[in-house]
Amino acid sequence: MSAVLDLVRDLIARPSVTPQDKDCQQMLAQRLARIGFQCETIARGGVTNLWARRGTQGPLVVFAGHTDVVPPGPREKWDSDPFVPTERDGYLYGRGASDMKSSIAAFVVAVEEFVAAHPQHEGSLAFLLTSDEEGPAIDGTVIVCDALQARGEKLDYCIVGEPTSTHELGDVCKNGRRGSLGGTLTVKGIQGHVAYPHLARNPVHQFAPALAELVGIEWDKGNEYFPPTTFQISNLNSGTGATNVVPAEAIVEFNCRFSTASTPESLKARVHEVLDRHGLEYDLEWDLGGEPFLTARGSLTDALSSAIQAETGLTPELSTTGGTSDGRFIAKICPQVIEFGPTNATIHKINERVALDCLDPLKNIYRRTLENLLLAH
């Protein structure tokens, strides 16, 4: 059995549904300590975080990941127990197989091999692991980044083990992510009888023209790395349930996924301008889930791309699509952040799985990336 497969099986067998860690990090810390890592647990709010570092000199290469997984859903719909790693038809099945316990296992083994071959390597290595990536993400990576910044630890490169590959290992890596700006809008009206609309003020009718304008706006044109910003209504609720009552208010929840071509302030200003111009009486609460980040082509993208090409023969696409990740926190303290891992077709789904024949190549890509970054210095 490969060392990566052995480790990922151990991790899957620990039912670490967010924010639980189920001693995944403790097991990994003990393993890393044997090859010279200094390990530190940072816990808050029921969340466990691990910062493990080997070396004190720069450059510092960090692997970031999460030991928590999403709930399995109805277990009876799985073909095998989601927390009993099962090999079948060339795949390893289990919750977290792709997202992202295989990446963690591959990087740990890659580091073990790298240190064994190059015990006096220049620079430093580190792991940043959390059990709060799939949850609210308020006691996880963000507080570790705050602690590192407060004590002046300088990160140079970070690889986040998110499952970025689309069709086969190595076809896509993420060199950035869009930002997320949510809003909860309450449009105020006057409740009344539908037969006497002149004695009421219907907030749905009032908001409809503004809604049509908002969904038709071209917020920006995107840029070389990002698609244009999008605006989507996710929920729209109004009324009492009765068919003869004009509602007193309409509550609208929306989200903007935005690129570096826009800022949260510019998006907020445009929304308020539309609402004000339509004469609406409203309250609007904003929630900035994360700002966009981007790592332009450079030493980290080149190191990873070269490693992928050497191992798979593929030239990876650099992409910024998809949802948010913990990379948004790390990018504030690390100038170069990239995400790379196995295929993502089954993440969060029933029968989540990872191809068995990608585990060792994934480990090799991570190891080659370390060699490209640290042995050239």
UniProtKB/Swiss-Prot annotation:
Listed cofactors: Zn(2+); Co(2+)
Pathway: Amino-acid biosynthesis; L-lysine biosynthesis via DAP pathway; LL-2,6-diaminopimelate from (S)-tetrahydrodipicolinate (succinylase route): step 3/3
Residues reported to bind Zn(2+) 1: H66, D99, E162
Residues in the signal sequence: none
InterPro entries reported in the protein's UniProt record: Bact_exopeptidase_dim_dom, DapE_proteobac, Peptidase_M20, Peptidase_M20_dimer, Peptidase_M20A
Chain sites annotated for binding Zn(2+) 2: D99, E134, H348
Keyword Transcription: no
GO terms assigned for molecular function: acetylornithine deacetylase activity; cobalt ion binding; succinyl-diaminopimelate desuccinylase activity; zinc ion binding
Pfam families (UniProt xref): M20_dimer (PF07687), Peptidase_M20 (PF01546)
Cofactor binding remark: Binds 2 Zn(2+) or Co(2+) ions per subunit.
One GO process term, biological-process aspect: diaminopimelate biosynthetic process
Domain of life: Bacteria
Entry-linked Gene3D superfamilies: 1.10.150.900, 3.30.70.360, Zn peptidases
Oxidoreductase as UniProt keyword: no
Record-listed E.C. numbers: 3.5.1.18
Record's function text: Catalyzes the hydrolysis of N-succinyl-L,L-diaminopimelic acid (SDAP), forming succinate and LL-2,6-diaminopimelate (DAP), an intermediate involved in the bacterial biosynthesis of lysine and meso-diaminopimelic acid, an essential component of bacterial cell walls.
Similarity section: Belongs to the peptidase M20A family. DapE subfamily.
Known partners and oligomeric status: Homodimer.
Protein name per its UniProtKB record: Succinyl-diaminopimelate desuccinylase
Organism encoding this protein: Bordetella avium (strain 197N)
Encoding gene per record: dapE
